[in-house]
Amino acid sequence: MSPSLREGAQLRESKPAPCSFSIESILGLDQKKDCTTSVRPHRPWTDTCGDSEKGGNPPLHAPDLPSETSFPCPVDHPRPEERAPKYENYFSASETRSLKRELSWYRGRRPRTAFTQNQVEVLENVFRVNCYPGIDIREDLAQKLNLEEDRIQIWFQNRRAKMKRSRRESQFLMAKKPFNPDLLK
């Protein structure tokens, strides 16, 4: 075997020194499988529930795990229904609804806006004339309909999406119909 082939074989057999910026080290694949990490759960709602006295419900204080609690490295993320707190077992139905409302900010949701029939009629009439109203029109509508301008903007976005979806569905139904050669005559 030539000296250059021997050097190549030796390089292949020897493992390179581990780098701190290698993919394996970044992903933690170079660590042992039985490693444990110290994790403290993130529970921001335990700090903000103290403001609930004005709502009449007692605040919910979830117990914190000690910081020494360790979890195995390969973390299996629980399904959403497992991850949700099981407070239904501890509170009445009205308290549960109130608690869900208090914690809903954590999920990034705001309460759904219920438009009255009159508001929908006015918005539909404006939509027929202009489906892309400017800020001045939206602010004027907000003042007249006693709504927030951003709710009106979202209503128009949703209405345009509904119109686009219905057009697509009607085009699909037209294309789905069997071709009739008698129509060409």
From Swiss-Prot:
Residues 108-167 bind DNA. It comes from the Eukaryota. Residues 32-69 are annotated as: Disordered. The keyword Aminoacyl-tRNA synthetase does not apply. Keywords: Developmental protein, DNA-binding, Homeobox, Nucleus, Transcription, Transcription regulation. GO terms for biological process: brain development; camera-type eye development; canonical Wnt signaling pathway; cellular response to cadmium ion; ERK1 and ERK2 cascade; forebrain development; forebrain morphogenesis; gene expression. The keyword Transcription applies. InterPro entries: HD, Hesx1, Homeobox_CS, Homeodomain-like_sf. Its main location: nucleus. It holds the Pfam family Homeodomain. PROSITE patterns: HOMEOBOX_1 (PS00027), HOMEOBOX_2 (PS50071). High levels found in the embryonic liver, lower level expression seen in the viscera, amnion and yolk sac. Can form heterodimers with PROP1 in binding to DNA Interacts with TLE1. Belongs to the ANF homeobox family. PANTHER family: HOMEOBOX EXPRESSED IN ES CELLS 1. Required for the normal development of the forebrain, eyes and other anterior structures such as the olfactory placodes and pituitary gland. Possible transcriptional repressor. Binds to the palindromic PIII sequence, 5'-AGCTTGAGTCTAATTGAATTAACTGTAC-3'. HESX1 and PROP1 bind as heterodimers on this palindromic site, and, in vitro, HESX1 can antagonize PROP1 activation. This is Homeobox expressed in ES cells 1. The lineage of its organism: Eukaryota, Metazoa, Chordata, Craniata, Vertebrata. The gene is Hesx1.
